[in-house]
Amino acid sequence: LLGVFHHTDLRKSLTVDEGTMKVEVLPALTDNYMYLVIDDETKEAAIVDPVQPQKVVEEAKKHGVMLTTVLTTHHHWDHAGGNEKLVKLEPGLKVYGGDDRIGGLTHKGTHLSTLQVGSLNVKCLSTPCHTSGHICYFVTKPGGSQPPAVFTGDTLFVAGCGKFYEGTADEMCKALLEVLGRFPPDTRVYCGHEYTINNLKFARHVESGNAAVQEKLAWAKEKYSIGEPAVPSTLAEEFTYNPFMRVREKTVQQHAGETDPVPTMRAVRREKDQFKVPRD
């Protein structure tokens, strides 16, 4: 147990700087991620799922940016539970989300509605399933050459997806394959939790012959051992090792004993919910 607590304290933040849009990956709680999305041109910033508000305020100050916007992926406390306190600490914030259960909500996002954070363009994507009001946020710099970013909350994880608490396999298929999966392959994926190693161990169980799974697992173990985040991934990568993004592949369908994506999604999710993660 000591090792676990020790590791929690050691989880490092990470700066992803690929152009005008800068993303600060901020570990929170035990395995959550918050993301400070900075427009380098205007020094305006948004925060995704600020469950630890004090840390968010300190990070914004450290980077010399003005926090204008909260992007909430869904209403669960470990994502939305800091909103009300953050708004007290930083009055006047715009708080976006797709669900009336979200604390501090000022702007309700709908599918394909857009907003600006400085010169960055943010598109809301409705991805109901984990929760009925789940939203992912697709962020681009118009006219810029840097890859887009998508903040996927508990819809898409590195090598996994969220539990279907308020939705169906059909909805998760739509979210992963039709909504998220159609964005450019180099889109950076920033998810809500660090579940990468366990997800990849399940992916290995589903497709034991998939070299992409083995390689990513070795890489993720290395990252974990030095306390570094395994985010972001890319959509292109997810299609190579994420069983829930691969429900159209024969290997995944055969494992599930199905021939169509939706029943495959249902079967693979059900199996993942019961999966005992091996130690290695």
Curated annotation (Swiss-Prot):
One GO CC term, this protein: mitochondrial matrix
Gene Ontology biological process terms, A to Z: glutathione metabolic process; methylglyoxal catabolic process to D-lactate via S-lactoyl-glutathione
UniProt xrefs under Pfam families: HAGH_C (PF16123), Lactamase_B (PF00753)
MF annotations from Gene Ontology: hydroxyacylglutathione hydrolase activity; metal ion binding
Catalytic reactions on record: an S-(2-hydroxyacyl)glutathione + H2O = a 2-hydroxy carboxylate + glutathione + H(+); (R)-S-lactoylglutathione + H2O = (R)-lactate + glutathione + H(+)
Cofactor binding: number and manner: Binds 2 Zn(2+) ions per subunit.
Distribution of this protein across tissues and organs: Testis.
Keywords: Acetylation, Cytoplasm, Hydrolase, Metal-binding, Mitochondrion, Transit peptide, Zinc
First-level EC class: hydrolase
N6-acetyllysine carried by residues: K61, K88, K201
Cited function: Thiolesterase that catalyzes the hydrolysis of S-D-lactoyl-glutathione to form glutathione and D-lactic acid.
Family of this protein: Belongs to the metallo-beta-lactamase superfamily. Glyoxalase II family.
Quaternary structure annotation from Swiss-Prot or TrEMBL: Monomer.
Name of this chain's protein: Hydroxyacylglutathione hydrolase, mitochondrial
Species annotation: Callithrix jacchus
Protein's gene: HAGH
